[in-house]
Amino acid sequence: MSIESSSTESSPNTEALQLNGTEVRILGCLIEKQATNPETYPLTLNALVTACNQKTSRDPVMNLTQGQVGQSLRALEGRGLTRLVMGSRADRWEHRVDKGLELVPAQVILTGLLLLRGPQTVNELLTRSNRMHDFEDSEQVVHQLERLIARGLAMLVPRQSGQREDRYMHLLGDPESLQELLAARQQAPERHSASPAANSRIDELEARVAALEERLARLEHAEE
């Protein structure tokens, strides 16, 4: 399947969407931390590197350096997708996805999840967003996903052999990266053949581990 996007609504600048893997990860992390840890947001460079290299709730797991993250932040800033916030103790970074891509809060959260974890089902997005946005049900998730698709920011990936549900993926990466991501997910089997309740429990445990990692990172940075 090729990556194609059609838009019935106004679309953001195409150049702004040609993001590499590091830029995709940075935006996803900034969106996530704004929603789950507002008291430490915007993020320092050190905190953002830790978030990017987090072992849970990330697909794929990455090992980025401060130099890589810093360079990508500047590139994103030039596209209007991040902003440097000067501070008395440390400079911090925030995303501008809502303004740069003209998204409402629900769409920002879904975009962040897709940036962090690749193609996902509606139920996965509903479960994983519970700490970030109050979606009443899966229909609300689908409605916002359809609006992202109409903007050319996401696409529906029909279920493949061995999969039970369709998936949705973002279209913010460069074409080559998106094709690689799509190919990898199409070849992957359904995540566990466990029940929805079991998968929900796994997501809950991942969220708890992520929260512990965030707390540890804050303690370490406080000692710097």
Curated annotation (Swiss-Prot):
Coiled-coil stretches noted in the UniProt entry, renumbered to this chain:
none
What InterPro entries does the annotation carry?
DUF480, WH-like_DNA-bd_sf, WH_DNA-bd_sf
Q: Which SUPFAM superfamilies match?
A: Winged helix' DNA-binding domain (SSF46785)
Pfam families reported in the protein's UniProt record: DUF480
Highest taxon in the source lineage: Bacteria
> What is stated as this protein's family in its record?
Belongs to the UPF0502 family.
Stored PANTHER family: UPF0502 PROTEIN YCEH
The name under which this protein is listed is UPF0502 protein Psyr_2419
UniProt organism field = Pseudomonas syringae pv. syringae (strain B728a)
